[in-house]
Design a protein with these regions (language model features):
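Divalent cation-coordinating acidic motifs and surrounding scaffolds
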Residues: 1-202
């Protein structure tokens, strides 16, 4: 894999504690699933089992996102064909760490958003952003402090990023007992966004 390793380069065999630890063998031949996948449920389950322990601390989800949608570079080459102008783009991130300025992703919430909007040719209505992260800095927080395998770090930069998308952004607590309500709300938003999406002329 050599030069193809690094943030933003799509799914590789999920590694780390409780990860699937195997190549999910996407039928697309790329690092993403598409409509040609014969068993989407099983393949998604394989790719989504990313584990509970990061092999590369600190986590930098926003830096990975920006690299994945960049118009050029190694990550762009690895993800070729994934970003389509005839479809909406749904970004989902799940982390118990704050993507802070000191040791987290480069840039700012405003810059991360600008990168996403640019990837969709300026059509912010074609984006949905979903985030599960620490809520310790909010009233009625579910998370306690991050200690070993419990709790989370407060995530003001991640919250600012999601909130900047208004009705097209949904936040939830990484420490919630169930993510069911979060994803049920997300599915509704994705459907509404798809229904209202008008693809640009090709």
């Amino acid at each position: 894999q050599g030069a193809l390793r690094g943030r933003g380069r799509g799914v590789v065999p999920p590694r780390g504690l409780q990860a699937s630890q195997k190549d999910c063998m996407f039928s697309s031949g790329g690092r993403y699933m598409d409509v040609s996948e014969p068993d989407l449920t099983s393949t998604f389950a394989c790719a989504a089992q990313v584990g509970t322990g990061s092999t590369d601390d600190p986590e930098k989800p926003m830096q990975a996102m920006v690299a994945a949608i960049a118009p050029a570079g190694d990550a762009h080459d690895c993800n070729l064909g994934f970003l389509r102008q005839d479809a909406i783009l749904v970004v989902t991130f799940i982390t118990d760490e704050d993507d802070n300025f000191g040791d987290g992703s480069a840039g700012t919430p405003e810059g991360w958003k600008a990168s996403l909007v640019a990837a969709k040719k300026g059509d912010e209505e074609a984006l949905v952003v979903l985030g599960l992260y620490g809520d310790n800095d909010q009233q009625n927080a579910v998370c306690g402090p991050l200690v070993d395998e419990s709790g989370a770090e407060p995530s003001p930069r991640l919250r600012q990023f999601v909130d900047s998308f208004g009705d097209h952004g949904i936040s939830g607590s990484i420490c919630a007992q169930s993510y069911g309500p979060f994803f049920a709300q997300a599915v509704g938003l994705i459907k509404t966004t798809c229904d209202g999406f008008i693809p640009p002329p090709m």
